Amino acid sequence: IRQEDTMLILFPDNPDKKYREVLVLVRPNELKEKWDGKRHRAHEATTLSGIQTIVWLDVLDGLLQPMIHLADNIYLNTNENDRKANLLAVRDYRFAEEMKSRYPLHHYKRSARIMRDLRAIKSSQEVAVIQQAVDITEKTFRRLLKFIKPGVWEHEIEAEIYHEFMMNRSAGPAYGSIIASGDRARTLHYIANNQQCKDGELVLMDFGAEYGGY
């Protein structure tokens, strides 16, 4: 579900099977949708995710408290990416502090290690989606072989990458594309992509398509 303010609650031991997996969404608001676009309705979220129980964020507190009282351990998500640069308190951390304040006698643990283990093993469906992303990337590379020539600008190459990704229904680049010609290829994470490619120069490219969240 690629939508802001979305939350997933997993409680495998909940006596009520209906609430063992819950998807929390912001309630659609027709006025806001005129400005920001449509948000998922409950039935749409179920179709996309397979999760049957959809609740709105504005009623989460009433649902969460009885669930918390049935649990001993609470696993919370935080950003444990070693490359993260944002030192400000983000929403996940604020939510964690709020939970600890409201339910101080529970045991709090990190969900990141569990998520890493889950990500390490892909289902056949996930592998198929990843392969689609790889195929789009390969197709884009072959397009660039015909496009790149002396005098072309790095950002023009990047534009071709975007074009091919979008034409193949990719969500866009999986990460910031590197198009580094000449001496700039020695910069490990060159992302300016704003120089002209000269005759005889090597062009280093690092790019990949995102497809289906992969």
Task: Outline where the language-model segments fall.
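Hydrophobic beta-strand core residues of beta-sandwich domains
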Residues: 68, 121, 148-149, 197
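A composition/biophysics-driven feature that prefers long, compositionally simple stretches
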Residues: 1-139
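A broad detector of the eukaryotic-type serine/threonine protein kinase catalytic domain
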Residues: 116, 142-146, 183-184
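Short catalytic-site patches enriched in acidic/histidine residues
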Residues: 97, 111-114, 152-214
